[in-house]
Amino acid sequence: MLDEKIKEKIIKELLPALEKEAWELSDDMAAHPELGSNEFESSRKIVEMLCRHGIQVEYPYCGLPTAFRAVINPGGKKKAAFLAEYDALPEIGHGCGHCASGMASVLAGLVAQEVRDTLEDVQIDIIGTPDEEWGGGKVLLQRAGAFKDYDFAAMVHMNGVDSAEAKF
């Protein structure tokens, strides 16, 4: 459990320091949308960002050329994952918001990297899940074993209203 000082640091220092970089990349992906299984520039730019922040990245991942897995606090007894989508739709680009949704997961991972010493025995991974609109990227990753051994996984998805839901 994070203590109040760490929570305050996240809200007052880390998020403001990291969000500009994350949202600039989201805007870049929105301006240069890539369809499923062709997210080569988007995935490369996300991976480069993660590496700049000292995060270990496996790329490509599980046989998918635009999938990746970034590992924060490796070796933890518990494993959690943030899933990041980044594919676009034909003609309307990022109308579904994957550029922003994916970057919200990446931003959560960047914050986790900054407070990794407080994570105790929890490994946090960011898993890039390509081709979500048409090809079922998460299904392909699951079949390749990408999600085995996780205790928890979550993702963000854009919505037209302010809401928070847990889907089980």
Question: Model-found features: residue ranges?
Answer:
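Histidine/acidic-residue-rich, glycine-tolerant segments that coordinate divalent metal ions
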Residues: 66-69, 87-95, 99-100, 119-168
